[in-house]
């Protein structure tokens, strides 16, 4: 079955064959055409055959028959049948009748030997079934099972087959050979033959032990022989086969069947097998037992077998063209169609279907269709343009099958034959399929709207939380509704069943929320968009309570107020107050408060029963804050009047205790006094210490008593009763109060009581402690890939208490959130910070902590960026070595890092030495280097390191030492693969042939052409140390030839040959002539062109032109032969023919054309028209409708019309007031069927006047005139 995509070779589907008949009998020739109704002519020796007593002509649909009755020696000769442009020739041979005795003797032995051979038992069964004799030319099975064709089989002079494979039969286990012969005299290349079983199975993929394909070529007869060998045949080998032969421009195929019989012994012949029904009538194949009839045998089927065979072939329905069905079906239907038609080799079917040519129907409505797809950025404009064949055609634009209406965003444009759809401000809703419909045709395209990358405008912030706290990461992107992905340590986060992660969108803001953080949630979190990503670190710490301010011991008197206050790090922590280990229950006098991080216990009207140990225990933490309340009891003793004043304190006056107060707290000194009369209390503060002076011993003192040393102080009197520092005095006590103690309040306070009886004095030392001052800005050093060293100095003032440690914080430079790096206080003045993100700028600050609390933060450090050194370079190789140089080459490191690469350093050292010498001052950005000035013969090791702002990375070292010495390398040409075959270039094209070579030292390069050195300015040679180039700027035919390049080093050389072929367009064919004309066809012949353009002629293009119109139409394209038949011409017309030649460059510039027209005569009597005297139709011009006076309005187009007749057609001229209007662009002149029109565009009053129309031809001249008045509108 021929491939659907190929043009049929002949108009006949069945061709008449040459026959040999006995004299006196009848000869019948049959032919079948492609379609019914096609006119068929029979000829003998070039003369048409008409129906008479000798010849019988019959036509039935597509079937045409020629019968030659009572054949005699005179009837022997050449016959032909013509249908359309196809002509088939065949021969009739007449032989004398053979003696009847020889025929009987030839038949008798065959019938007697038939039952003796076991292999011929199936033939007996065939005879029992009523099988007819095999047709002429069929194959037969020999003793060894081979198939031999009939010696009398005629050759087919039209098809490609000289001998076609015939149907055959074989017994199970036997062998059979099918042969096909193809004539090769007219073929330029060997034909391609394929063997198929069924419709699809290509037997070339089944070649093995039981199936082999052979081919041979007989040079004497120029005949190709192709054979299909089937050995050890099985029942599965039976079926229909097909042989296909194809050349470059022809194709032919032949179907044949193979019947496989079961092996049956001579004594086991079962006559019942002759009456079993088979699945395929007439094929002789035995079916399975499931197809046999149960019950009695039907002997009538045996008698009707032969007739059923003959009728089944005639009544079989026409076979469906499966190729055409598959071509029109979608790929999803391939499997169903293959199943319906019994196709099992789906892979072979798809392979063959893919190789078929798809004949696309050329559009008649569109000259230029839409592209398959368009792409546009979101918010931009797109134009979809088509070009129509009819400029006046109406178009409709569809979007997803719905018609588009014109609006502000959709604009339709029509410019000539172009139709344009413009879509402005494209959005994602415009991403759809679009169609342009013109009448019944349409072209489709698809528009893809590309969104711009979504950028992150505000990055994520690092966070430090405790276990159980809520975490929320927030970022802001450039587009609302953008899709983002959240990742943790590189793994995408999803909404789990526990809803651990919650994602929130608010306009351009995106949030990742973790309700209760756990230790497993710590890590690096990232948000990723189409335009980038942002990273942040989450640190989760276990809860650890810190005490910023502990409770202190108190000493109060009766009826006073006692306040215990402490401050912890967590404001959500609650606690319990204990008194001597028992929980304290609040009442009207005892109050407990919790405000933020401050817990306070207040006791009003202190009594002696309140003196005890008080403790605060935070809930959930193993922590206990304790303090003691001292009750100062005032004892009232009876004293006589005139009692000297006395200050009653627990501490002796000579060595007073230091009273410590925290800055910002309230200081209250309650000093009990006594004396009668009531003493005067004086409070003083020592502000300046003077020089000490020596004093002699008091009078009456012992001699050995040493001199007392006294200090002289400048004292400040404190007597204010209101304000921050105040003194309140009653009869029995004096109270000194300082609100919000400050550092300036620190010092020695003197209390003096006086009355007439005497005085008493006590010194009280007050020390104010505070948080330390803020340390100086920390310094950053040793910055690594994800770590750095932070160093700082102690604070200038420690707050009066030793510094217990330091707290370190960091933040990203563009962020506002500081993240704490340590919970345990740092005792040292340096710390190594880790877990930073490479390439992100950070800042550091530090806090100092003492017993009072934490200082203010230090100024931020200078911004720094963690950057690690790059990795080591890879693939370090030695490219070349000379006596003093070594060429190195390497690749960049696999890990570059955020710091990029500043360059590479190269070093070398002697083998066995550890001292590396720099080979290059500074860094090189290239990945190769030529190290010069090396000692000859030295064995050196080389290493390369990559550098960036973080410093050098790891080195890569050559595996073995390199000997610095020139290596003698044999010259060798490395000819590229595409230069090993003939190099074809078109005339005028540049030629650039680059040939690499090897060899050391540098070889000498020599070019020659046809054995002669190259000369001339048009050919230039360029040589380098590694290659040579042959360059021709503009190629000419003279540059064709054989070029040889030679590389030589001393007595060693290597050669390569290149064949350059410069090709051009061929010259036109020669000597075109008309060989024969018959019916509606003309046979042409020509000779190949004299100049083939220096390349093979690919074919010819044949064109025809009617003598009347001289419009050329292509009849044949890429036609290989030098003769052809042009058919389907019109009777009575004359035609010119011309032929172009083609090669790989193109078609010839000129064509070979017939000089005289070829007329297609009408069959039958030739009509001779009567001769008449020619009439003279010439006539002088005359106006049948003259011009009329008109009055028009200015600004509106006006038309002047008249009608003229004349022969030949007169020349028309228009005048205004005697001036010719032919070159004035404001006037348009028309002439159609004798009607003359003058159009005046937007006339003005100046256009008024007398207009004249003049008509002139060879016979005379005529003119008419009118007056035109142009009125101005009022």
Curated annotation (Swiss-Prot):
Gene behind this protein: Mybpc3
Binding site for Zn(2+): 212, 214, 227, 229
Keywords, sorted A to Z: Acetylation, Actin-binding, Cell adhesion, Disulfide bond, Immunoglobulin domain, Metal-binding, Methylation, Muscle protein, Phosphoprotein, Repeat, Thick filament, Ubl conjugation, Zinc
Disulfide bonds: 436-443
Signal sequence coordinates: none
PANTHER family per the UniProt record, alphabetical: PTHR13817:SF168, TITIN (PTHR13817)
Residues recorded with modification Phosphoserine: 47, 279, 288, 307, 312, 427, 459, 550
Residues recorded as bearing Omega-N-methylarginine in the entry: 1241
Cited Pfam families: fn3 (PF00041), I-set (PF07679), THB (PF18362)
PTM sites of type Phosphothreonine: 117, 287, 607
Superkingdom, natural source: Eukaryota
Compositionally skewed regions (Basic and acidic residues) per UniProt: 95-104
GO terms classed as biological process: cardiac muscle contraction; cell adhesion; heart morphogenesis; myosin filament assembly; regulation of heart contraction; regulation of heart rate; regulation of striated muscle contraction; sarcomere organization
Function as written in the Swiss-Prot or TrEMBL entry: Thick filament-associated protein located in the crossbridge region of vertebrate striated muscle a bands. In vitro it binds MHC, F-actin and native thin filaments, and modifies the activity of actin-activated myosin ATPase. It may modulate muscle contraction or may play a more structural role.
InterPro entries tied to this protein: FN3_dom, FN3_sf, Ig-like_dom, Ig-like_dom_sf, Ig-like_fold, Ig_I-set, Ig_sub, Ig_sub2
Listed name of the protein: Myosin-binding protein C, cardiac-type
Residue positions where N-acetylmethionine is found in the record: 1
Domain Fibronectin type-III: 774-870, 872-967, 1068-1163
CDD domains noted in UniProt: FN3 (cd00063), Ig (cd00096), Ig_C5_MyBP-C (cd05894), IgI_C1_MyBP-C_like (cd20962), IgI_C2_MyBP-C-like (cd20967)
Modified how: Substrate for phosphorylation by PKA and PKC. Reversible phosphorylation appears to modulate contraction.
Entry's Gene Ontology cellular component terms: A band; cardiac myofibril; M band; myofibril; sarcomere; striated muscle myosin thick filament
Region feature Disordered, mapped onto this chain: 95-153
Ranges of biased composition (kind: Polar residues): 128-149
Sequence similarity: Belongs to the immunoglobulin superfamily. MyBP family.
Ranges of residues in domain Ig-like C2-type: 8-95, 157-259, 361-452, 452-546, 645-765, 971-1059, 1181-1269
Transmembrane segments: none
